[in-house]
């Protein structure tokens, strides 16, 4: 089975409908006193400190927290909501996953890809230094526990790398966490690969623990990674089988990617049935998590 790349899109309707679930399942940081987002359903306006282009349509943005000692208030594998009000008075709400360390103080980082029809992503890309954006959260996604799984597989595409990178970063940061990680990450071109320097540095420092494969749909002549889409055969040959002990697979990407790899989520509270490549390989609902 071949897996297509496509833009990740989230609608304000979905974000709003999920709000009651999200905020009844909060991931509060260990130090609640310094947390900026406290899980109380209150929007907090934060100022853009700086931004830089990562590619022709992707930016890294640093937002200031209220004080130099403030933390954002998220834990590993959690996210937040962003909001802005249009000139006509409509609320636009979208979820994003920060890529900075949850324990970072004074600021945090988002990586945002702009899509032609993406109201929030276009708005964020137009922000200037000193402009503010409203945030709320945190949103729990998955409660990571070190060493719960001997080995995990992360399968992502496009900006779907952000929650997967959170897991990679947390495992790398914790010397007691010996979880082995396989990352299969697909994009259209080399310029679309996000966080590559950070991921490569981790894999180079701990090659026995972090196994990374990049896939390009449109590789250049000198590309040394994998060509084409993430195939069922590649997953089978480069990660633990479904009958392995305590196996876990994490998936994040656009809707066509979910459909091909794992099957779609039904709602924020319902992971849906496992379908696609992972179903064909024998994985069940307990073994697969869809961000």
Swiss-Prot record:
UniProt xrefs under Gene3D superfamilies: Nucleotide-binding domain of ferredoxin-NADP reductase (FNR) module, Translation factors
Keyword annotations from UniProtKB, A to Z: FAD, Flavoprotein, Membrane, Mitochondrion, Mitochondrion outer membrane, NAD, Oxidoreductase, Transmembrane, Transmembrane helix
Domain FAD-binding FR-type: 41-145
Pfam family, one: FAD_binding_6
CDD domains: cyt_b5_reduct_like
GO cellular component, one term: mitochondrial outer membrane
Sequence positions that bind FAD: 148-183
Keyword Mitochondrion part of the UniProt annotation: yes
Major localization class: mitochondrion
Reactions listed under catalytic activity: 2 Fe(III)-[cytochrome b5] + NADH = 2 Fe(II)-[cytochrome b5] + NAD(+) + H(+)
Subcellular localization(s) per the UniProt record: Mitochondrion outer membrane
Cofactor(s) for this UniProt protein: FAD
SUPFAM superfamilies linked: Ferredoxin reductase-like, C-terminal NADP-linked domain, Riboflavin synthase domain-like
Gene Ontology MF: a single term: NADH dehydrogenase activity
PROSITE patterns referenced in this protein's UniProt entry, alphabetically: FAD_FR
Secretion signal span: none
Class of this enzyme: oxidoreductase
UniProt record, GO biological process: cellular response to oxidative stress; ergosterol biosynthetic process
InterPro entries per the UniProt record, alphabetical: CBR-like, Cbr1-like_FAD-bd_dom, FAD-bd_FR_type, Flavoprot_Pyr_Nucl_cyt_Rdtase, FNR_nucleotide-bd, OxRdtase_FAD/NAD-bd, Riboflavin_synthase-like_b-brl
Transmembrane segments: 7-23
Enzyme Commission (EC) number: 1.6.2.2
Membrane-related topology note: Single-pass membrane protein
Family from the record: Belongs to the flavoprotein pyridine nucleotide cytochrome reductase family.
Record function comment: May mediate the reduction of outer membrane cytochrome b5.
Protein name in UniProt: NADH-cytochrome b5 reductase 2
């Amino acid at each position: 089975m071949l897996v297509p790349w496509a833009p990740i899109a989230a609608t304000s309707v979905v974000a709003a409908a999920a709000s009651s679930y999200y905020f009844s399942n909060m991931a509060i940081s260990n130090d609640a006193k310094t947390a900026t987002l406290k899980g109380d359903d209150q929007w907090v306006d934060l100022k853009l400190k700086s931004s830089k282009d990562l590619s022709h349509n992707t930016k890294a943005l640093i937002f200031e927290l209220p004080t130099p000692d403030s933390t954002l208030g998220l834990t590993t594998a959690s996210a937040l909501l962003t909001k802005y009000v249009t000139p006509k008075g409509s609320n636009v709400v979208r979820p994003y996953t920060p890529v900075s360390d949850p324990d970072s103080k004074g600021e945090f980082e988002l990586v945002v890809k702009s899509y032609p029809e993406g109201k929030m992503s276009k708005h964020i890309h137009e922000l200037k230094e000193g402009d503010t954006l409203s945030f709320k959260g945190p949103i729990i996604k998955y409660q990571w526990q070190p060493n719960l799984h001997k080995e995990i597989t992360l399968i992502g595409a496009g900006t779907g790398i952000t929650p997967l990178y959170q897991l990679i970063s947390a495992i790398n940061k914790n010397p007691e966490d010996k979880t082995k990680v396989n990352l299969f990450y697909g994009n259209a071109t080399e310029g679309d690969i996000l966080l590559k320097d950070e991921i490569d540095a981790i894999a180079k420092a701990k090659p026995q623990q972090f196994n990374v494969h990049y896939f390009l749909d449109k590789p250049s002549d000198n590309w040394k990674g994998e060509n084409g889409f993430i195939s069922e055969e590649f997953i089978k040959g480069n990660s633990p089988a479904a009958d392995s002990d305590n196996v876990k697979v994490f998936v994040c990407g656009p809707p066509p990617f979910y459909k091909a790899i794992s099957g779609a989520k039904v709602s924020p509270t319902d992971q849906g049935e496992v379908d696609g490549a992972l179903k064909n390989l024998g994985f069940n609902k307990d073994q697969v998590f869809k961000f």
